[in-house]
Swiss-Prot record:
GO terms, biological process: galactosylceramide biosynthetic process; galactosylceramide metabolic process; glycerolipid metabolic process; glycolipid biosynthetic process; myelination; spermatogenesis
Tissue specificity remark: Expressed in brain, testis, kidney, stomach, small intestine, liver, and lung. Not detected in heart, skeletal muscle, and spleen.
EC number: 2.8.2.11
An MF annotation (GO) of this entry: galactosylceramide sulfotransferase activity
Organism, scientific name: Mus musculus
Glycosylation sites: 66, 312
Membrane topology recorded in Swiss-Prot or TrEMBL: Single-pass type II membrane protein
Spans within the Cytoplasmic topological domain: 1-12
PANTHER family the UniProt entry points to: GALACTOSE-3-O-SULFOTRANSFERASE, GALACTOSYLCERAMIDE SULFOTRANSFERASE
Known catalytic reactions: a beta-D-galactosyl-(1<->1')-N-acylsphing-4-enine + 3'-phosphoadenylyl sulfate = an N-acyl-1-beta-D-(3-O-sulfo)-galactosyl-sphing-4-enine + adenosine 3',5'-bisphosphate + H(+); a 1-O-alkyl-2-acyl-3-O-(beta-D-galactosyl)-sn-glycerol + 3'-phosphoadenylyl sulfate = a 1-O-alkyl-2-acyl-3-(beta-D-3-sulfogalactosyl)-sn-glycerol + adenosine 3',5'-bisphosphate + H(+); a beta-D-Gal-(1<->1')-ceramide + 3'-phosphoadenylyl sulfate = 1-(3-O-sulfo-beta-D-galactosyl)-ceramide + adenosine 3',5'-bisphosphate + H(+); a 1,2-diacyl-3-O-(beta-D-galactosyl)-sn-glycerol + 3'-phosphoadenylyl sulfate = 1,2-diacyl-3-(3-O-sulfo-beta-D-galactosyl)-sn-glycerol + adenosine 3',5'-bisphosphate + H(+)
Function: Catalyzes the transfer of a sulfate group to position 3 of non-reducing beta-galactosyl residues in glycerolipids and sphingolipids, therefore participates in the biosynthesis of sulfoglycolipids. Catalyzes the synthesis of galactosylceramide sulfate (sulfatide), a major lipid component of the myelin sheath and of monogalactosylalkylacylglycerol sulfate (seminolipid), present in spermatocytes. Seems to prefer beta-glycosides at the non-reducing termini of sugar chains attached to a lipid moiety.
Keywords for this protein: Glycoprotein, Golgi apparatus, Lipid metabolism, Membrane, Signal-anchor, Sphingolipid metabolism, Transferase, Transmembrane, Transmembrane helix
Gene name for this UniProt entry: Gal3st1
Full protein name: Galactosylceramide sulfotransferase
């Protein structure tokens, strides 16, 4: 008599129970990792809000930049307001290298690679913060809160940020963050971005989870209300406030020219601003914005458009003051030096997809559900003169933060879970 196999009821029940427990754990972790969107403007208590107190007679800058005009001193106290999808990861690498080279003190987030974004920045979020502590460089993603940031740096600190054509920024943000913005899940077209732009008011809800990624993201990152009426006088007031607070607003589209101005402002050496493009996205199978869709994306992000137009104009005034011919010479010098380093450092001479990256230490962070961010392979035979610089120039943000001593336990746990679940 043939016995029928027993149904694995107990195994299924155990699997369901484990799945439920694991899901509950993920939800609990997620509720801790992702902060509320609109908390109070500042978390720091009045007792802990003591301003930065430099050590008496502590030098602000120790060594003059080689060949710098007028014997200026390199600036070492820098606040970089790291905006999203603006080549900011490339600029971050430049700041990491400079800070590491000169043994400067970074203000890092505690447990993550951002300051609990999209919450407003508070100095209490800084790793190992103590009232009165001073830091040289603040450069991780945050939602900007000027007073809180100001309390962590010396009075002479340089404030910089970078912006981008709002339509292009919207396109990049939509593709990168779309999978974690639930309002996009109802879009059924292959080209979800085009479908969204046909009637954005139909889909968009400013109170929806992560909706801030899909409208006026620059305005939001800088700490302002991204749902303001574009005709409101508050918009221009905010733009002028940014102009007063920031010494330089870089343009992503003119990144090399921006770095020349930044080098002049900070009195740095050419080597300090060399770079490889980091966190770049693989070409999408969906065509880039053009024509009518570009116009729709621009109209959808009018606050950012006003901000961009203002600082685009001021940027070119700075270029004129710097000198057009001098700018052309120094941009050519920077590009030649970058090309020289590319031949020395990069295996194959160009960025590759995630699947082709051989060293996990060079693997960039990927968006949920798709490996669209490019990275590099380091050449195996690099002379001792360039080996350290090459590795530092190519190291992605998360790995570099760890190298610099940042506590990233939440980010690393999240990566482990994503790898385990193959997200």
């Amino acid at each position: 008599m043939t016995l029928l196999p027993k149904k694995p009821c107990k195994s299924k029940a155990k699997g369901l129970l484990l799945g439920a427990l694991f899901t509950s754990f993920l939800l609990l972790l997620y509720s801790y990792v992702v902060p509320p969107l609109y908390p109070n403007m500042a978390f720091t208590t009045s007792e802990a809000a003591a301003p930065c107190s430099p050590i008496p007679n502590e030098p602000v800058a120790a060594t003059p930049a080689n060949g710098s005009a007028g014997g200026c001193q390199p600036r070492r106290d820098i606040v970089f307001m790291k905006t999203h999808k603006t080549a900011s990861s490339t600029l971050l690498n430049i700041l990491f290298r400079f800070g590491q080279k000169h043994e400067l003190k970074f203000a890092f987030p505690n447990g993550r690679n951002d300051f609990h974004y999209p919450s407003y920045f508070a100095r209490s979020l800084v790793q190992d913060y103590r009232p009165g502590a001073c830091f040289n460089i603040i450069c991780n993603h945050m939602r900007f809160h000027y007073e809180e940031v100001r309390g962590l740096v010396r009075p002479g600190a340089t404030f910089i940020t970078v912006i981008r054509d709002p339509a292009r920024l919207f396109e990049s943000s939509f593709h990168y963050f779309g999978s974690v913005v639930p309002l996009t899940w109802k879009l059924s077209s292959r080209d979800k971005l085009a479908e969204f732009l046909q009637d954005p008011d139909r889909y968009y809800d400013p109170s929806s989870y992560n909706a801030h990624y899909l409208r006026n993201l620059l305005f939001f990152d800088l700490g302002y209300d991204s749902s303001l009426d574009p005709a409101s006088p508050r918009v221009q007031e905010h733009i002028l406030e940014v102009e007063r607070r920031f010494h330089l607003v870089l343009l992503q589209e003119y990144f090399d020219e921006s770095l020349v101005l930044l080098r002049e402002l900070l009195c740095w050496d050419l080597e300090d601003v060399l770079y490889f493009k980091l966190n770049a996205r693989r070409d999408s199978p969906v065509p880039r914005l053009s024509g009518e869709l570009y116009r729709r994306a621009t109209a959808w992000n009018l606050l950012d458009v006003r901000l961009y137009r203002h600082f685009n104009a001021s940027f070119w005034r700075k270029v004129e003051a710097f000198g057009r011919e001098r700018m052309a010479r120094e941009v050519a010098e920077l590009r030649q030096a970058n090309e020289h380093m590319r031949h020395i450092c990069i295996d194959g001479g160009q960025a590759v997809g995630a699947e082709a990256i051989q060293d996990s230490a060079m693997q960039p962070w990927q968006p949920l559900g798709i490996k669209s961010i490019l990275g590099y392979n380091l050449k195996k035979s690099i002379g001792p003169q360039h080996e350290q610089l090459c590795r530092r120039m190519l190291t992605p943000e998360i790995q570099y933060l760890s190298d610099l001593g940042a506590n990233l336990w939440v980010t690393k746990l999240w990566k482990f879970l994503r790898d385990f679940l193959r997200w």
